[in-house]
């Protein structure tokens, strides 16, 4: 559960780490974070529609409160990501792009570690039953 999404996130991170342009690095790092968020939602979300629309970061904060700080951080980068995707590339410095790549990698690693731990606990509890 979530491995495919985390694999796609790792691929986006690998692309971000080798991209030359700051804007491309920024976009790929944000894409990686979105893919990690999708893996969290796949692992945790229950089909309980509330009737109101929410973005991925709101959902992550709701279904996995331990990642709420990450969700808030990446939600705060959303407007800049949209501007860069629309072609306003000069607003992202190399430093900002590097920082976002590093943050997306840290988010990925934390989610991967927690999901692996949850799978181990689930496997052990099913063995005991």
Predicted ranges, named:
Residues 1-129:
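Terminal alpha-helical segments
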């Amino acid at each position: 559960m979530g491995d495919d999404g985390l694999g796609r996130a790792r691929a986006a991170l690998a692309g971000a780490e080798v991209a030359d342009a700051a804007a491309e690095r920024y976009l790929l790092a944000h894409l990686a974070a979105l893919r990690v968020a999708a893996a969290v939602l796949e692992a945790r979300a229950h089909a309980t529609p509330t009737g109101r629309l929410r973005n991925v970061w709101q959902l992550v904060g709701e279904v996995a409160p331990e990642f709420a700080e990450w969700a808030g951080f990446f939600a705060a980068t959303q407007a800049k990501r949209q501007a860069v995707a629309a072609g306003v590339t000069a607003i992202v410095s190399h430093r900002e792009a590097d920082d976002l790549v590093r943050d997306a990698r840290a988010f990925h690693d934390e989610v991967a570690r927690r999901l692996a731990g949850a799978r181990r606990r689930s496997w052990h509890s099913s063995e005991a039953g």
